[in-house]
Regions:
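Positively charged, low-complexity intrinsically disordered leader regions
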Residues: 1-75
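Phosphate/diphosphate ligand-binding glycine-rich loop within oxidoreductases
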Residues: 55-158
Length: 158
């Protein structure tokens, strides 16, 4: 248990401010914030390897949007979501109203009602994925500000 306490101490002693912040580009984060993320990952790994529950959620959805093919990332996101107690729902743009002109704002708010996190993998074209994810983040912020969403889900660049 000392190992776990070490991770928690490291997290508490960082000068990281990650609450309600998305990590879309790692180079936009401070070294302290990245250290905090790595310590959180180590703490979760410790708990899992010692058969201690890591469920943070009783229920909730983790939405995944993959705009290009992926195996490792898709299953890593699903496993991490499950580890925290979330059910994964894949968003297939071809089977949604996105294909018929629904805006990013409409889609982002619609899929966010019971979602805790939205994971997006979009790296087919340099810079385009980050621009899309930033637009989704702005739409979520606006949805929360206008009272459309009770809470804003986290946004993760996969």
């Amino acid at each position: 248990m000392k190992e776990f306490e070490h991770y928690i101490s490291n997290i508490k002693n960082t000068d990281a401010s990650l609450f309600q912040k998305d990590i879309l580009l790692t180079w936009e984060r401070s070294v302290e914030e990245l250290k905090a993320v790595l310590n959180i990952a180590d703490a979760l790994k410790y708990l899992h390897s010692n058969n201690i529950s890591t469920r943070l959620f009783e229920s909730g959805i983790a939405v995944s949007l993959f705009r290009d093919n992926s195996t490792r990332t898709r299953f890593s996101f699903a496993s991490a979501s499950n580890l925290l107690g979330l059910s994964v729902q894949d968003l297939d743009e071809g089977k949604s109203q996105i294909a018929h002109g629904e805006t990013v704002r409409e889609t982002a708010n619609m899929i966010s009602f019971l979602s805790e996190v939205i994971g997006i993998r979009d790296d087919m074209y340099l810079g385009a994925g980050n621009a899309f994810m930033s637009e989704v983040g702005e739409a979520l912020d606006l949805g929360k500000e206008e009272g459309v969403l009770n809470q804003r889900p986290a946004l993760v660049n996969l």
